[in-house]
Structure formats: structure tokens, C-alpha cells
Swiss-Prot record:
The gene is fabZ. The keyword Lyase applies. One of its GO terms (molecular function) is (3R)-hydroxyacyl-[acyl-carrier-protein] dehydratase activity. The active site is at 48. This is 3-hydroxyacyl-[acyl-carrier-protein] dehydratase FabZ. It catalyses: a (3R)-hydroxyacyl-[ACP] = a (2E)-enoyl-[ACP] + H2O. Pfam families: FabA (PF07977). It is an enzyme of class 4 (lyase). Involved in unsaturated fatty acids biosynthesis. Catalyzes the dehydration of short chain beta-hydroxyacyl-ACPs and long chain saturated and unsaturated beta-hydroxyacyl-ACPs. Keywords: Cytoplasm, Lipid A biosynthesis, Lipid biosynthesis, Lipid metabolism, Lyase.
Length: 144
């Protein structure tokens, strides 16, 4: 299990854009699972929506990508690299995510060749699917 500090040692995201609180399972290069505790204090709720707070769907997809990035970047040969979105396919939002929800995140790498890959992500709240998507990614080097 990885806590937020350990996650920050693997991926470069920081508040307010680190969207994973814990990683509970990792198979390096293959899959990862974790969660985000969604609180009323999230920055995005200030504008989405003030009187009816709902987590933006694109941030649910980003949280899935961050869990997947942990799986990829934990592999020794990928340490220190960055994972970038290359595309999103078959994305569906099934339920709203609201303050107080624990967003469970899982991403399985379907294929990875060279520096390009694809993964299948599923996000759930209370065992019910709230989002599914296929995410394409590219691993790159940090540019100075």
C-alpha cells in the first residue's frame, strides 16, 4: 500500500491536482488500484457547482490515469519518466461523484509497446461503476 507521500515520489502531481490518496494494489507495469476520498473542501467544488457539488468527470478520468501512472512508473526502467495522455476512448460516466464519496480507482494496462500504451480504467463508488474509459498514454522524459 502506498500513501500520498509515497505516491508523490513516483508521479509528479501535487495539490490541488494529486487526485489519488492511496494506492492499495500494484502489479508493476500491469495494473494498480487505489482510492480518492472526495471531500467538500476540494478546490473544484468552488465552481462545479457551488449549490450542487459534483466531481467533474474529466477529473475522475485524470484520477484513473494517475493510478495507472503509478503502475507504469514503479517499473525500474520507467522511474523518473512522465506519463502523458495520448487519447481517451469509450469513456462513459454512469453516476455522479459527490462530497463524502470514496472513489475507488483501478487501471489495467492492456498493451504497452515502446513508449505508447493503452489501459482500461474503472472508477466505482460503493461498488457501483461511476466511470469507465480506455486511456492511451505515452511515456516521455522530463524536458529542461
Amino acid at each position: 500500500m502506498l500513501d500520498a507521500q509515497q505516491i508523490k515520489e513516483i508521479i509528479p502531481h501535487r495539490y490541488p491536482f494529486l487526485l489519488v490518496d492511496r494506492v492499495t494494489e500494484v502489479e508493476e507495469g500491469k495494473r494498480a488500484a487505489g482510492y480518492k476520498n472526495v471531500t467538500v473542501n476540494e478546490e473544484f467544488f468552488n465552481g462545479h457547482f457551488p449549490d450542487y457539488p459534483v466531481m467533474p468527470g474529466v477529473l475522475i478520468v485524470e484520477a484513473l490515469a494517475q493510478v495507472g501512472a503509478v503502475a507504469l512508473l514503479m517499473k525500474e526502467e520507467n522511474r523518473g519518466r512522465l506519463a502523458f495522455f495520448a487519447g481517451i476512448d469509450s469513456c462513459r460516466f454512469k453516476k455522479q461523484v459527490k462530497p463524502g464519496d470514496q472513489l475507488h480507482l483501478e487501471l489495467e494496462v492492456l498493451r504497452f509497446r515502446g513508449s505508447i500504451g493503452k489501459g482500461k480504467g474503472v472508477a466505482k463508488v460503493d461498488g457501483e461503476v461511476v466511470c469507465e474509459a480506455e486511456l492511451m498514454f505515452s511515456l516521455g522524459e522530463k524536458q529542461e
